[in-house]
Amino acid sequence: MVLNIKAPENIVLKPTITVFGVGGAGSNAVNNMIHANLQGANFVVANTDAQSLEHSLCINKIQLGVSTTRGLGAGASPEVGALAAQESENEIRSSLENSNMVFITAGMGGGTGTGSAPIIARIAKELGILTVGVVTKPFHFEGGHRMKTADKGLIELQQFVDTLIVIPNQNLFRIANEQTTFADAFKMADDVLHAGVRGVTDLMIMPGLINLDFADIKAVMSEMGKAMMGTGEDSGEDRAIKAAESAISNPLLDHSSMCGARGVLINITGGPDMTLFEVDNAANRIREEVDNIDANIIFGSTFNPELKGIIRVSVVATGIDADKVPKYKLAIDKNTNTLPEETYNESIIQHTQIETIPSFNSYSTENIEINESSIKQDYTGNEQELRLHVNAVNKPENNSQKSSFLGKIWESLRTSNNQTLERKNVIVNTVDQDNKESDIHDIPAFLRKKRD
């Protein structure tokens, strides 16, 4: 009797991280990461432009929408980009299978990235993959149409990703100077993605005292909405604090403050000379910035012999909410007929509803925009004055005079009608309803209303 006994094959159990570049911008980002020899991640690029795809350094390439675009690109149409991705859904699904985490990088505002990225994100989510979007927004000089296209693409993409990081290209001017080349500027934006991926992979593959597993990372990044990534390196005195400061103040990101973040992933990497106190100082500085006692903060520390004398701090903050109240959309106070005092500090005031001002048939007071310069002018001298006498509605008990909103409406109308009024002083008076000196209120002719 012969027994055939085979030793079990060595199975490497480790999370698979995929960086998926979409369109021209996404492909360029992947090329830069390959140039930088990033370890611990697989790379895939997908494009509708066959020529651009051919020049990619990535081995795994997907030609999107062969029948839809014939390799000629999406023509800046997100609809075409989406159709191309849907046509190539099987290839996309195959490239993502067995991945535990995927970073989808693209440029918003064009055709392929804007249209295809949400489709790829949806497929990743259907496969149960932790999905992170890292995308750019156009420069201002690229025009309003491209910016609107980008915003629509972001809304679509955010439905399918666990975490979304937005890098406005316009923010490159914060760190660039007159000598910065165009290529170097885009590499700065790509470095945000590079640093974020490296921060995650280092925690799992680099040796260290405090290593994290993939479940820790998933706990911080799953279903967390908007996020920011940052990294900082420093040497010399106070290197840990300085590196942490650089990591938490990334000038390129759309949401550059991690205050109030619900999840935080911290990776502090250094050489064998890194001390306990330095790790403590860096971690505490980030915790202070987050300022949320309920935040899920996951910390790891690894060693890298190449960083002798240097400390690198990487941070991923997730669950960063957008502004709760849109700017310049303030309601008028029902009790005083006036705007909140802080309104006057804004450059533009947009009123969407006015409930307590009397209605006039000849003019609608809805959706009025008033420039601050037409409201906050100082009027002096004896030039012609505009006097508006308006019955007080819901008059305050103390009878104190309030700046009437109707006066601001009238001033806006005078300006928009190109009437030449040398504005020196606007006097807005409140007249007691019992004052019956005149049967007609002293207001502009087209607003006149006889007393009942």
Swiss-Prot record:
GO terms for molecular function: GTP binding; GTPase activity. GTP binds at residues 24-28, 111-113, 142, 146, 190. Keywords: Cell cycle, Cell division, Cytoplasm, GTP-binding, Nucleotide-binding, Septation. GO terms for cellular component: cell division site; cytoplasm. SUPFAM superfamilies: Tubulin C-terminal domain-like, Tubulin nucleotide-binding domain-like. InterPro entries: Cell_div_FtsZ, Cell_div_FtsZ_CS, FtsZ/CetZ, FtsZ_C, Tub_FtsZ_C, Tubulin/FtsZ-like_C, Tubulin/FtsZ_2-layer-sand-dom, Tubulin/FtsZ_GTPase_sf. Its main location: cytoplasm. It is found in: Cytoplasm. One of its GO terms (biological process) is division septum assembly. Pfam families: FtsZ_C (PF12327), Tubulin (PF00091). The keyword Coiled coil does not apply. Essential cell division protein that forms a contractile ring structure (Z ring) at the future cell division site. The regulation of the ring assembly controls the timing and the location of cell division. One of the functions of the FtsZ ring is to recruit other cell division proteins to the septum to produce a new cell wall between the dividing cells. Binds GTP and shows GTPase activity. Belongs to the FtsZ family. Homodimer. Polymerizes to form a dynamic ring structure in a strictly GTP-dependent manner. Interacts directly with several other division proteins. This is Cell division protein FtsZ. It comes from Rickettsia prowazekii (strain Madrid E). The gene is ftsZ.
